[in-house]
Amino acid sequence: MGAAKNIWALANAEDAANDAEQIPYSSFVVDTSLPLPLMIPRIIELCKDLFKNWGELDDSLFSVERVSGGITNLLLKVSVKEDTNKEVSVTVRLYGPNTEYVINREREILAIKYLSAAGFGAKLLGGFGNGMVQSFINARTLEPSDMREPKIAAQIARELGKFHKVDIPGSKEPQLWVDILKFYEKASTLTFEEPDKQKLFETISFEELHKEIIELREFTGLLNAPVVFAHNDLLSGNFMLNDEEEKLYLIDFEYGSYNYRGFDIGNHFNEYAGYDCDYSLYPSKEEQYHFIKHYLQPDKPDEVSIAEVESVFVETDAYKLASHLYWAIWAIIQARMSPIEFEYLGYFFLRYNEYKKQKPLTFSLVTSHLSASL
C-alpha cells in the first residue's frame, strides 16, 4: 500500500510542477475476495472518502454493479444520485491480487494521464490502495468476432495509429524482452500447492523456453522494427464501442510501454482467437492488409504501397511469435498468483504450442523478406 501511495505522490508532484489538477488518493484497500454484496459497502465508503462532495450523501443514493470480469482486474460501475438528483457514474477498477508480478503500476499511472490528455481511454479521477477510479464510458465492450468486421477493424487500425504517435516522457527503450525475461525468472522458480498443477508445471522445459526467448529476440532484431508507445494488450475487452455515435474507445493501459510496433499489431491479431485460442480465427492475409493500410494511411488507405504493407505484414508476423511467448509465460505466473477461476496452465500450453506451430512458417517468411530486401 505504501508503494501505491508513493506512485500517486509522484504523479501528483508532476502535476503540481505544471500547475495541473491534483488527483485525489485514498489509502483504502478493498478486499477483492469478498462477494459483491459484501464488497458494495466498502466501495461506497471508498468513493465517499475520495470525492468529498459525496461524503455526506446517504448510502441509498449509490448503486454498484459489476461491468466486467476479465482475468486480471474487476471493474465496477458506481452510480450516484447527487444533490441535484442528477445521476453520475464512475468506474472503479480493482487490481487483481499479486498483479504487481506482471504489471508495472508506476509505469501505468505515469503514462495514463498523458494518454487521457491525448484523448485515449477514460479520465483518471482518483487512486486508492489497490485500484483506481475513472470516468465511466457509455459503450459496449467488443467481442473477438467484432474485431474482424471490416468497418470496426479499420476503426481500430486508425485509433492504434494515433495511439502510437503519443509521446510519453521517460525512457524510450522497448520493454518486450525485459518484461519477458522478468516473467521467465519469476515463472521458473514457482511451486504449486496443488499436486495436479505441480505435476503439469513440471512438464514445462524452462531450459527450452529460455532458448526460444533468446533465439526469437535475436531473430526479430534483424527487422529493426520501429519503437512506439504500445498498448501491449489489444484484446477485444480493451475496446469499447458506442454504436449510436460510432465512437471507438481504447482502454486499460496497464501493460503499456515503449515497445516494437509489430508486437502491438501482432498481439492484436492473435486476440482474434479469443481466450479459447481458436487460431483458425487468425486474420487472413487480406484482412491483415486491410488493417495495415488503415493503420498507415487512415485517410487514404488505398494509396499505401504494397511494399509498405508487406513490410509491416512481415514485421507483425514475426512479433506475433513474441506475443505467444509473452502471454504463455505470463500465464504460468497467473496460475500460481491469481485467485480468478481460469485454466492458466492450460492457456500456457495453448499459446506455447501455437508458437511452436507457427515458428517455422514465420521464420521462413521473414528470412525470404530480408533476403529480397538486400
Curated annotation (Swiss-Prot):
Pathway: Phospholipid metabolism; phosphatidylethanolamine biosynthesis; phosphatidylethanolamine from ethanolamine: step 1/3. Disulfide bonds: none annotated. Pfam families: Choline_kinase (PF01633). GO terms for molecular function: ATP binding; ethanolamine kinase activity. Belongs to the choline/ethanolamine kinase family. The gene is EMB1187. This is Probable ethanolamine kinase. It catalyses: ethanolamine + ATP = phosphoethanolamine + ADP + H(+). InterPro entries: Kinase-like_dom_sf. It comes from Arabidopsis thaliana (Mouse-ear cress). GO terms for cellular component: plasma membrane. Keywords: ATP-binding, Kinase, Lipid biosynthesis, Lipid metabolism, Nucleotide-binding, Phospholipid biosynthesis, Phospholipid metabolism, Transferase. ATP binds at R93, D252. Involved in phospholipid biosynthesis. Catalyzes the first step in phosphatidylethanolamine biosynthesis. Its EC number is 2.7.1.82. The keyword Lipid metabolism applies.
